[in-house]
Amino acid sequence: MRKKVIAGNWKMNKTLEEGLSLASEVANMAKDEVPADVNLVMCIPYISLAAVSKVINDKVAIGAQNVYQKESGAFTGEISAPMLKSVGVKYVIIGHSERREYFGETNQQLADKVTISLANGLTPLFCCGETLAQREAGIHINFVNAQLTESLFHLSPEDFKKVVIAYEPIWAIGTGVTASDEQAQEMHAKIREHLASKYGAAVADEISILYGGSMKPDNAKGLLACKDIDGGLIGGASLKSRDFIDIAKSY
């Protein structure tokens, strides 16, 4: 049975005080409202990780939004996997489309980040996805497959099974274009098919694949009903406790 995962990505939002308030609200609501088989994750700014980890309960796990690919050293401004682990982090987003676009992160860099995260007991939330131009050119499936191959396929089957994948249809995020349930399911099925080509159908069927294309309370139920969509990587809606919890109740 694949894990159901609803992960919130706060991005660069919320001061420490605001973050503590939101995290407390989510944790308290989750305790009473979210089904036991749904894994809730909040991926929050570095400055709030240690403090928030102390105010949540066992219904919510803490995630980071990035990690550096080395254990330690002279890398000013970076945060390592051992540091994240030391403050209670369980998950880490790797390869978000914004990191790829604004910071030029490459598939090889992301492969290194995945490796070091797993070595330190963190669960990678690995992001992949295509732009509108790539989709319209008909190369979107090959493009996403290449992201997966170059960043994940060096892993052993045992390590690979610890990864959670998030599909981000970049063309449907903040563009006014909406991905239908059918389009989302098609890409998730193609991703699982590609995973099976490397690791076999049994392993591929264990991997949770989240949808990261503007999931909200009003579209979550349809998306989460799709055969190959196991959860969501939530952006804006994760900044409102009620919306985030309502999405988690949509299975």
Curated annotation (Swiss-Prot):
SUPFAM superfamilies: Triosephosphate isomerase (TIM). GO terms for molecular function: triose-phosphate isomerase activity. Pathway: Carbohydrate biosynthesis; gluconeogenesis; Carbohydrate degradation; glycolysis; D-glyceraldehyde 3-phosphate from glycerone phosphate: step 1/1. Gene3D superfamilies: Aldolase class I (3.20.20.70). The keyword Isomerase applies. It comes from the Bacteria. InterPro entries: Aldolase_TIM, TIM_sf, TrioseP_Isoase_bac/euk, Triosephosphate_isomerase, Triosephosphate_isomerase_AS. GO terms for cellular component: cytosol. The active site is at residues 96, 168. It is an enzyme of class 5 (isomerase). It is found in: Cytoplasm. Its EC number is 5.3.1.1. Keywords: Cytoplasm, Gluconeogenesis, Glycolysis, Isomerase. The keyword Disulfide bond does not apply. It catalyses: D-glyceraldehyde 3-phosphate = dihydroxyacetone phosphate. Substrate binds at residues 9-11, 174, 214, 235-236. Involved in the gluconeogenesis. Catalyzes stereospecifically the conversion of dihydroxyacetone phosphate (DHAP) to D-glyceraldehyde-3-phosphate (G3P). Homodimer. Belongs to the triosephosphate isomerase family. This is Triosephosphate isomerase. The lineage of its organism: Bacteria, Pseudomonadati, Bacteroidota, Cytophagia, Cytophagales.
